[in-house]
């Protein structure tokens, strides 16, 4: 995929670790001499994949038996709250995953951040003919009059709908609410074809 660039950062974020509230490795979940740990990561969130694979390797080196599962955000948090998984290492707070934490927070424990310099953004292809969000409304036709978004339940989606679109006069653009994999597929297809595209995105990714 060709390079992309940010038009504007509209929310700071912290990447943190969330676990099942009752999660414990003391004498439970053992198979022979190996304790089991179940990690879960969100589809399409590459920084989550990286940190999950890192901790999978670290835990396996310490003698744990580790299972890593990939899901969309909704089923991920539901499964975590239901006890199907022990740890999620890529919780985006306070905005992107806010709705899920509000819904399932009583069943979860926040273990703290590992990256406090993340951000939510609107991004375009590197060679796009605009340089800022202020220019997007008057050049919407160059981007098929669309902003490609992710899941409806994501805080990134709600802040785009409630703050970015009205704040920058983008009400006449079609905000396509889809999924993270669908957004990334649209982004890749457009950049590979040399077309202009505007998406909701985040850093790191």
Predicted regions and their residues:
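Short helix-initiation/N-cap motifs at beta->coil->alpha
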Residues: 43-46, 67-79, 175-186
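Immediate post-signal peptide segment of exported/extracytoplasmic ligand-binding proteins
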Residues: 24-39, 59-60, 137-144
